[in-house]
Swiss-Prot record:
Binding site for NAD(+): 274-288
Keyword Hydrolase found: no
Localization: Cytoplasm
Main location: cytoplasm
One Gene Ontology cellular component: cytosol
Subunit structure: Homodimer. Heterotetramer of two MnmE and two MnmG subunits.
Gene3D superfamilies given in the database record: FAD/NAD(P)-binding domain, GidA associated domain, C-terminal subdomain, tRNA uridine 5-carboxymethylaminomethyl modification enzyme MnmG/GidA
Cofactor(s) needed for function: FAD
Natural source organism: Brucella melitensis biotype 1 (strain ATCC 23456 / CCUG 17765 / NCTC 10094 / 16M)
Protein's recorded name: tRNA uridine 5-carboxymethylaminomethyl modification enzyme MnmG
């Protein structure tokens, strides 16, 4: 960056974590000249906490990131060392692909993809301040005095925003262990009028795997046939490993209870609220003290790394207490502690300050993604980063933003939850958060989102070809199975028990029966044997859900109609007779743009919605496709 021209970009992304990498890549793929600002290049893609990607709900997000040509799925496929499909025995809608990852492989693979991305420049340095021209972002000032000009900024600070690490009675500023926090940006955000809060997360101690008694432990293997995250991955080639399973003991619990006053969580040192679904071991003992033990997964951090991550004992107890705890856990009696567990507090912004494009309402061109929005988890961060980066590029180019609806993607569910409801604790994704789980499956993420990625210009030619090849194969298989039919009487000859109503049923219809798969149908129609395994699985799942999907479409249509009914920007909520003063205040503060958004405002009632619709009609509001106007007219 030797010339003045090199200091001007369309989009600047601050932070090289999971949100930052996806944001920078998406902005660059969208054609924006993009800068990724990070303290050090070698920390790009670091897995700060657990060495794993995916899981229940989270695996859906990774598949959606991949369907939009993001990075996380491909990187996880390269670095994954223990692939497991969670909820395999349940329906496809709630299955969760997951892998443990080699930390080093993951980081290096992510850095390689960032380096190879066109339109993307990595700028080493700390972001000290944001530069504005009126109420519009115009640049970033670095700690060394350099000023980078831009049309949009994506802020992905993770736990670095006023980060504070706690280990027992000790506490010190840090973004994560061994790295400095970002101290200046919080003041700038406060000056913009944003509402900031404090959240907390934690991590367990790291252990020397050579000092663990693996022989005494139960071991968990990877799936025999690993299921990749990415459409671009033909098969997993990285060696797969086992992890160990152990449990805390009553003696463990006694030590924790005796030292609760020394835990940062229970001594009053920590202000922030921690994640409900990833509690510290202190929380587990206090809240579930009647249990004899709590499960711990001992996850190796790499193929050539002896470090082990004990998943299940996140803690902020003093180091000496952590050592005592280890001695009471089977298999860990002689384990050497390489790094103590710790809690970390950090600033976040109330995500209700955001539009669904992830642009802030107060500052034009400023986008937020990841833990700064109150979420927890790599996958949640990466998904937000991709959407924020794409929309930052579109903002810089003067284009309308891309809004993902709740009916389209788990990303849409998450963003809508954040921007309409806010957070009282770190938010993580679950399949139960989605109203239309049957539609939003991990296996159909490509069908749902890849055409959109192509439409907005962030899809590579290689992925386009692969997607079209797969869709063509599925379409042909669907056509063939729908063209073949059989009577109930003849089906009985092949031991298929159908209702004897005389109605012919197609092979496609038969696949909806729980005890019928393609293998059984090949006995009737041998030509079906030519369908390849990937297409076969997709066809079976599609046919299985076809009837239920038809029923769900009416519910989806209702929600889509509500999304289309726009609330005019000039509507005076105070003038709506019959609304309580409390609701008027909430609506003025929240500024919902559609009836669907208004329905998700706390305290809104069906009667209040009816009053609001009547006022819109009186005002002269009219229905238009949300895709044509939402976030792009009054929100622009």
């Amino acid at each position: 960056m030797s010339s003045a021209e090199a200091l001007a970009f369309d989009v600047i992304v601050i932070g090289g974590g999971h949100a930052g990498c996806e944001a920078a890549s998406a902005a660059a793929r969208a054609g924006a000249r993009t800068a990724l600002v990070t303290h050090r290049f070698d920390t790009i893609g670091v897995m700060s906490c657990n060495p794993a990607i995916g899981g229940l709900g989270k695996g859906h997000l990774v598949r959606e990131i991949d369907a939009l040509d993001g990075l996380m799925g491909r990187v996880a496929d390269r670095a994954g060392i223990q692939f497991r499909l969670l909820n395999r025995r349940k329906g496809p809608a709630v299955r969760g692909p997951r892998t443990q990852a080699d930390r080093k492989l993951y980081r290096l693979s992510m850095q390689q993809m960032i380096t190879e991305q066109e339109n993307l420049t990595v700028v080493e340095g700390g972001a000290a301040d944001l530069v504005c021209d009126g109420e519009r972002i115009s640049g970033v000032t670095l700690a060394d005095g350099r000023v980078l000009k831009c049309g949009a900024v994506v802020l992905t600070t993770g736990t670095f925003l006023n980060g504070l690490i706690h280990i027992g009675e000790k506490r010190f500023p840090a973004g994560r262990m061994g790295e400095k926090p970002a101290l200046g940006l919080s003041e700038r955000l406060l000056s913009f009028g944003f509402t900031l809060g404090r959240l907390k997360t934690g991590t367990p101690p790291r252990l020397d795997g050579r000092t663990i008694d693996w022989q005494s432990l139960d071991m968990q293997s990877a799936d025999e046939e690993p299921v990749p995250f990415s459409l671009m991955t033909d098969r997993i080639t990285t060696p797969q490993i086992e992890c160990g399973i152990t449990r805390t003991t009553p003696e463990t619990h006694d030590i924790i209870r005796a030292n609760l006053h020394r835990s940062a969580m229970y001594s009053g040192s920590i202000e922030g609220i921690g994640p409900r679904y990833c509690p510290s071991v202190e929380d587990k003992i206090v809240k579930f003290g009647n249990r004899d033990g709590h499960q711990i997964f001992l996850e190796p951090e790499g193929l050539d790394d002896d470090t082990v991550y004990p998943n299940g004992i996140s803690t902020s107890l003093p180091e000496d207490v952590q050592l005592e705890i280890l001695k009471t856990i089977p298999g860990l009696e002689k384990a050497v502690l390489l790094q103590p567990g710790y809690a970390i507090e950090y600033d976040f912004i109330d995500p209700r300050e955001l539009k669904r494009s992830l642009e802030t309402r107060k500052v034009c061109g400023l986008f937020l993604a990841g833990q700064i929005n109150g979420t927890t988890g790599y996958e949640e961060a990466g998904a937000q980063g991709l959407l924020a980066g794409l929309n930052a590029a579109r903002r810089a180019a003067g284009s309308e933003p891309v809004i993902l609806q709740r009916t389209e993607a788990y990303i849409g569910v998450m963003v809508d939850d954040l921007t309409s409801r806010g957070v009282s604790e770190p938010y993580r994704m679950f399949t139960s958060r989605a109203e239309f789980r049957l539609s939003l499956r991990a296996d159909n993420a490509d069908q749902r989102l890849t055409p959109l990625a192509d439409e907005v210009g962030i899809l590579s030619e290689e992925r386009r070809k692969r997607y079209l090849t797969r869709e063509t194969a599925l379409s042909h298989a669907r056509m063939v199975t729908q063209s073949l039919s059989i009577t109930p009487n003849l089906a009985g000859y092949y031991d298929l028990r159908l209702n004897q109503d005389g109605v012919r049923r197609s092979a496609y219809d038969l696949l909806s029966y729980p005890d019928i798969n393609l293998d059984r149908l090949i006995a009737i129609w041998p030509e079906l044997a030519s369908i390849d395994p990937v297409t076969r699985e997709a066809l079976e799942i599609e046919a299985q859900y076809a009837v239920y999907m038809e029923r769900q479409q009416s519910d989806i249509a209702v929600m889509e109609r509500e999304e289309r009914l726009l609330i005019p920007s000039g509507l005076d909520f105070d003038a709506i007779s019959g609304l309580s003063n409390e609701l008027k205040q909430k609506l003025k503060q929240r500024k919902p743009e559609t009836i669907a958004e208004a329905q998700r405002v706390d305290g809104i009632t069906p009667a209040a919605v009816a009053l609001l619709i009547a006022q819109i009609r009186k005002f002269g509001g009219r229905q238009k496709l949300a895709a044509e106007t939402l976030e792009g007219k009054g929100a622009a």
